[in-house]
């Protein structure tokens, strides 16, 4: 099992290219099921999760051409040989569940296992299923599988989500592209990745308006066509590297960064005393901190355009070194402070009270062996390790590989002393 060895204390200096967005790529790949024509995706991130999904698509009959190391992925779902997504594959990653709607929209039926993925609270798929039912799908849940049928096709519906859900918004939008009539989504999520998906689907011939606002309208069409589409840059990866540079100190420029999508994070870094130069026209973000003490900043995670839950763990790692006390409130997912006890092993002073964490800044973190528990938690330990004194070992980094492309290479190119090793946990 791989692990990362990090010798902290080295400031970072250089440029880091931002990869394609995992959270966008996973939904874009599923869109191939809606057409019998080939699709080419560029700027596709090479991640464990995107590779898992490619394997599932192959099981369904999609032709996948995606050479190792390439950022261009070709998908052709001309002939689907199966509409069953088995537990063995769906359990590896929650986003696999999103094949359900497109399969029903195109084939009239599907059987898909309930999802797996990061162990972050309950994260139910009720909203997904309620939306499909509203569009006329007949659903049964049996032995861990959702069996769905819409023999005469899906029908447009007026759907008002009881809570804001990125996954349910995207899933319903995918299915509605081929439904008869108009589907209106109210209380829709507004994340940039939803806009990215809508842009791609519209390029394929869909009729979607309002993506990025709380009300999305989808006029169903008879068929979608193939296209070539570039995956948007990953705002979570960009934010992660920004916080790594702020924690370790130094001068790092992020190239190809989605500046407009990171307003909340940029504001919090500036509030914490970090110098941030963001250039939307050039798609660059420059992070500088040379000896300036960090200030404690409190925040609550919120749906976009608020502070993203997927950057909460990274920001907590940064706040462990700030002067003062910060309160971090998690409002999106339950049980998303699993990184707190591992950060405490490095000397952080964190008290978790339900959905709230109180972080009292310390003068110095000290290296220790730690264990990754989920994707974002794992990278928070890397950030802390870059700032800690001594050698930190991060075990179980398979979580990290699910969402970060060549992390150690990108950090290493900026002067981080970080190395991947194989073998037993330390």
UniProtKB/Swiss-Prot annotation:
Positions of phosphoenolpyruvate binding: 22-23
Cellular localisation: Cytoplasm
GO biological process: cell division; cell wall organization; peptidoglycan biosynthetic process; regulation of cell shape; UDP-N-acetylgalactosamine biosynthetic process
Main location: cytoplasm
Ranges that cross the membrane: none
2-(S-cysteinyl)pyruvic acid O-phosphothioketal modifications at: 118
Enzyme Commission code: 2.5.1.7
Active-site residues, Swiss-Prot/TrEMBL: 118 (proton donor)
Listed GO MF terms: UDP-N-acetylglucosamine 1-carboxyvinyltransferase activity
Reactions listed under catalytic activity: phosphoenolpyruvate + UDP-N-acetyl-alpha-D-glucosamine = UDP-N-acetyl-3-O-(1-carboxyvinyl)-alpha-D-glucosamine + phosphate
Any single Gene Ontology cellular-component annotation: cytoplasm
UniProt KW keywords: Cell cycle, Cell division, Cell shape, Cell wall biogenesis/degradation, Cytoplasm, Peptidoglycan synthesis, Pyruvate, Transferase
Root EC class: transferase
Pfam families with a match to the protein in the record: EPSP_synthase
Pathway(s) annotated for this protein in UniProt: Cell wall biogenesis; peptidoglycan biosynthesis
SUPFAM superfamilies named among the record's database cross-references: EPT/RTPC-like
Residues bound to UDP-N-acetyl-alpha-D-glucosamine: 94, 123-127, 310, 332
Function: Cell wall formation. Adds enolpyruvyl to UDP-N-acetylglucosamine.
Family: Belongs to the EPSP synthase family. MurA subfamily.
Protein name as catalogued: UDP-N-acetylglucosamine 1-carboxyvinyltransferase
Annotated organism of origin: Hyphomonas neptunium (strain ATCC 15444)
Gene that this sequence comes from: murA
